[in-house]
Amino acid sequence: MLLLVEDQSFFNHPGVDVKEIVRVLRDYWLYDKPIRGASTLTQQLIKNTLLTREQTLSRKFNEVLMALLLESAFDKDFILNRYMNTVYLAQQGNKAIYGFEKGAKFYFNQPIGTLSAEEMATLVALVKGPDYYHPIKQAQRLAKRRQLVLTIYHKFEKIVK
């Protein structure tokens, strides 16, 4: 579910998705803003664990370079596992909740392997911004994002069957 929403070509790119970058550049040219992001899961992992949040060209260049280096040093399963264990999903007082396993316990009080599709979609929805999609403060916003995740997931399910 995560890859369907965040990086459908994860297993087919070298850490950077050139087609998505070209699409974002086109969007900038046509609309003066991107319609959606182009960062791969590998780039998100680099950004979340090694770089600052500043939005500069030099930071983006470093992110791309480091993603390419990471992909040349580690296999996709390692990178995906690392992402799933380090992605920020919640804040509980002064304690941050990182990773899907801890997120499942925090939000649903159960191991990740026992989550329903809707519960898993909630965690995937939160990846985009745990504060922006806060389950209590922004319940409607989260519900809309969760529904989008489920729609993408169910479309893929139909294609596979």
What is each model feature region?
Residues 1-42, 82, 93-103:
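Flexible, acidic/glycine-enriched loop-and-adjacent beta/alpha segments
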Residues 46-161:
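Non-catalytic, structured segments within soluble enzyme domains
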